[in-house]
């Protein structure tokens, strides 16, 4: 019996210290494939399926990665995001480059992220549709359509 209490006393702090992180992102969390980009100014629709461009949401981190139709790897990025009501706010963009400590994107490196549908260092999208299969978001210039993988 004494041995049982010693094990319990030793293991209790370990069990109490564990914390499960949860997310309130609902259907947003997961792996999304960018399928279409609509340019609102001229109503041009660009099919992105062959580009293999992906957005991956988890907790408050967004990962952008993909490859072009010629299988060329795209630059990978990490961003912070906030989903509040029907607004998706993106900020704090970092280029994945471990040798350079994942530098923050600035005006000179911003064009590298354009293929992902992001044109500003701080971007705001209105969420037009979001469920466990499809997401449509829009800002002042673009409408982005995704399917969930």
Please give the residue ranges for each predicted region:
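C-terminal motif of bacterial Sec signal peptides marking the signal peptidase cleavage site
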Residues: 14-17
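Signal peptide cleavage region of secreted peptide precursors
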Residues: 19-25
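Contiguous, well-ordered beta-strand patches that form the walls/edges
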Residues: 38-45, 49, 61-130
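Short, hydrophobic/aromatic-rich segments at coil-to-beta transitions
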Residues: 29-31, 59-63, 130-136
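Tryptophan-anchored aromatic micro-motifs
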Residues: 27-43
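Sec-dependent N-terminal signal peptides
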Residues: 6-9
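Positively charged n-region of N-terminal signal peptides that target proteins for export
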Residues: 1-4
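Edge beta-strand at a domain terminus
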Residues: 78-86, 130-149
């Amino acid at each position: 019996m004494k041995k049982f209490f010693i094990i319990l006393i030793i293991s209790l702090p370990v069990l109490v210290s564990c914390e499960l992180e949860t997310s309130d992102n609902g259907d947003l969390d997961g792996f999304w494939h960018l399928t279409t980009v609509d340019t609102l100014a001229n109503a041009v629709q660009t099919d992105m399926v062959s580009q293999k461009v992906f957005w991956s949401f988890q907790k408050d981190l967004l990962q952008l990665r993909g490859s072009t139709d010629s299988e060329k790897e795209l630059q990978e990025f990490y961003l912070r995001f906030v989903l509040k009501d029907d607004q998706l706010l993106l900020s704090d963009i970092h280029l994945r480059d471990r040798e350079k400590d994942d530098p923050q994107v600035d005006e000179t490196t911003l064009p590298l992220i354009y293929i992902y549908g992001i044109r500003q260092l701080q971007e705001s999208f209105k969420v037009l549709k979001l469920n466990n299969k499809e997401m449509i978001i829009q800002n002042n210039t673009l409408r982005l359509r995704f399917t969930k993988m």
